[in-house]
Regions:
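Conserved acidic carboxylate
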Residues: 10
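Acidic, metal-coordinating helix/loop segments flanking the phosphotransfer/catalytic sites
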Residues: 34-54
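Active-site residues of response regulator receiver
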Residues: 58-59
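Two-component/phosphorelay signaling modules centered on CheY-like receiver
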Residues: 13-33
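Negatively charged, flexible loop motifs adjacent to catalytic sites
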Residues: 62, 88-92
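Short amphipathic alpha-helix used as the core "switch/output" element in two-component signaling
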Residues: 67-79
Length: 94
């Protein structure tokens, strides 16, 4: 099985590292890039969206929003699959 080329947009280094470790135990995974904010996530996607099979996106970033990243992915011709994360467990977010 070929590794899943994964792009991660997550502003917390601890969550990002734990997420990668957990996923690597479950599936063959190749993290192709990571971003911590909307601007750098969009910049990478503009140049490399075709280089990933899966995007894992945190909705609430310290700078910007994961929603803008998801909108940009929606506009790509070859869209990778997306997983949306949130560290907030409020009723509104659910």
């Amino acid at each position: 099985m070929e590794p899943v080329r994964t792009y991660i947009v997550e502003d917390s280094p601890i969550i990002r590292e734990n997420l990668i470790a957990a996923l690597e135990e479950l599936v063959p995974l190749e993290v192709v890039a990571c971003a911590e904010d909307e601007h750098s996530a969009l910049h990478w996607l503009h140049e490399h969206a075709h280089d990933c099979d899966l995007c894992i996106v945190d909705i609430f970033l310290k700078q910007g929003s994961g929603l803008a990243v998801l909108r940009a992915l929606r506009d790509e011709r070859r869209r990778p699959r997306c997983v949306v994360l949130s560290n907030y467990a409020t009723v509104d977010v659910r």
